From Swiss-Prot:
This is Deoxyribonuclease-1. PROSITE patterns: DNASE_I_1, DNASE_I_2. Its EC number is 3.1.21.1. Its cofactor is Ca(2+); Mg(2+). It comes from Bos taurus. The record marks E35, V89 as: Involved in actin-binding. CDD domains: DNase1-like (cd09075). The only differences between the A and B forms and the C and D forms are in the compositions of the carbohydrate bound to Asn-40.
Length: 282
């Protein structure tokens, strides 16, 4: 009996050690994330609960001109320790008066930010830019995983231009390679990569999909929406042998927070109409 208990304890400790050495990453489109949402204590508590699952999380649809909502979120996340989460945030992005930011939240005890940049996609006023919201790129150093340095490219595509924007992510990858001499890159976000925005016949024209360089971790069969639709809008794509070999098999999936927390449809949709998509690295 004592030996059985000891074995159980050792297995539990091994599991905790493995958890400590792994890295959990997600992309989460929080619909209209701003002061109104973060002023609702119930919604804020669920958002905080979801974010705390991750070591790095990309939040999209940040509608927060003065970063008041971002500040509130960080206050909640760091209420016990001011260094639990740090952040990187983009400038407001968009071709017209409607603007969004990309927000990266990360645990500094697990990763460090080495560099950041905003992808230059051409002349917006000339009408020859590639993206409605130019991808934000962050280079991370991981303290524990097989891949020690990797970049994350964030994209929330414009639904009407999803095919062209996803295709243009191929050029963003080449730009990251050239700028940082880095092959290990994760491209993620709400690509609007399914249903009427990207049809099955259009995939053959998307280089990010046809090139063998890239692995698509969230399949077309996934449902990343909290609505009645069944669409794999949100994706995680990885390139580079070290990063690809660091992915825990079967770990990439949407996180259905409605089912996990027993929420009503109304409450789930109040949080967001998208589920986070997540993956674990070791």
């Amino acid at each position: 009996m004592r030996g059985t208990r000891l074995m159980g304890l050792l297995l539990a400790l091994a599991g905790l050690l493995q958890l400590g050495l792994s890295l959990k990453i997600a992309a989460f489109n929080i619909r209209t994330f701003g002061e109104t949402k973060m002023s609702n204590a119930t919604l804020a508590s669920y958002i905080v609960r979801i974010v705390r699952r991750y070591d790095i999380v990309l939040i999209q649809e940040v509608r927060d001109s003065h970063l008041v909502a971002v500040g509130k979120l960080l206050d909640y996340l760091n209420q016990d320790d001011p260094n639990t989460y740090h952040y990187v945030v983009s400038e407001p992005l968009g071709r017209n008066s409607y603007k969004e930011r990309y927000l990266f939240l990360f645990r500094p005890n697990k990763v460090s930010v080495l560099d950041t940049y905003q992808y230059d996609d051409g002349c917006e006023s000339c009408g020859n830019d590639s993206f409605s919201r130019e991808p934000a790129v962050v280079k991370f150093s991981s303290h524990s995983t097989k891949v020690k340095e990797f970049a994350i490219v964030a994209l929330h595509s414009a639904p009407s231009d999803a095919v062209a924007e996803i295709n243009s992510l191929y050029d963003v990858y080449l730009d990251v390679q050239q700028k940082w001499h880095l092959n290990d890159v994760m491209l993620m976000g709400d690509f609007n990569a399914d249903c009427s925005y990207v049809t099955s016949s259009q995939w053959s024209s998307i280089r990010l999909r046809t090139s063998s360089t890239f692995q698509w971790l969230i399949p077309d069969s996934a449902d990343t929406t909290a609505t009645s639709t069944n669409c794999a809008y949100d994706r995680i794509v990885v390139a580079g042998s070290l990063l690809q070999s660091s992915v825990v098999p079967g770990s990439a999936a949407p996180f259905d927070f409605q089912a996990a927390y027993g929420l009503s449809n109304e409450m789930a949709l109040a949080i967001s109409d998208h589920y986070p998509v997540e993956v674990t690295l070791t």
